[in-house]
Amino acid sequence: MKKLLCAVLLSPLLYSNAVLADDAKQLRETLTGTESLKADFKQTVTDVNKKVIQSGAGVFALAHPNQFYWHLTAPDESKIVADGKDLWIYNPFAEEVVIMDFTQAITASPIALLVHRDDATWSQYAVTKKQDCYEIKPKATDAGISAVNVCFNKGTLNKFNVLDDKGNLSQFDLSNQHSISTGDKALFKFVLPDNVDVDDQRIKTQ
């Protein structure tokens, strides 16, 4: 899951800038209608030879602006929570919590477009529409994620996948999608567990 927060590879553009701009506009308009979302997910990870190397399940949620929740419940528990300012990565098995600046951690990933609305963030990616899906590729040259595909059914996000630079493809199928309720807002507030090691990587201001 940390790979979702890494920098991403530059890939060749196959379409004109005008077409890409139109596709990005359509995706942006679709996401504007999704101010918040909560869903269950099933995850399947395949390697470069299309062999399944991991399966999992959990709960996914997002809310505008800049709030994100990811709780992998199987096979091993892990949690990622972004409250709009900080991002927390919790590994219960290792009894460790990593804290990062939200903008620094998430902006380098195409996943950022799901929770960001600002022009500066969108200008960092090339978007290509393919039927009901949008392929998002970064314009950066750092290693990490090669592309993200997000797919919609009647305007509702129903699946997405993440391709990393090693050829591993993580596919996520969503179900039970609905808007965030008042009670669900607590998902975006991370409560630090007792007796865990804390690795605070936030940039300290003088």
From Swiss-Prot:
It is found in: Periplasm. InterPro entries: LolA/LolB/LppX (IPR029046), OM_lipoprot_carrier_LolA-like (IPR004564), OM_lipoprot_carrier_LolA_Pbac (IPR018323). One of its GO terms (cellular component) is outer membrane-bounded periplasmic space. The keyword Protein transport applies. Pfam families: LolA. It comes from the Bacteria. Keywords: Chaperone, Periplasm, Protein transport, Signal, Transport. One of its GO terms (biological process) is lipoprotein localization to outer membrane. Residues 1-21 form the signal peptide. Gene3D superfamilies: Lipoprotein localisation LolA/LolB/LppX (2.50.20.10). Monomer. Participates in the translocation of lipoproteins from the inner membrane to the outer membrane. Only forms a complex with a lipoprotein if the residue after the N-terminal Cys is not an aspartate (The Asp acts as a targeting signal to indicate that the lipoprotein should stay in the inner membrane). Belongs to the LolA family. This is Outer-membrane lipoprotein carrier protein.
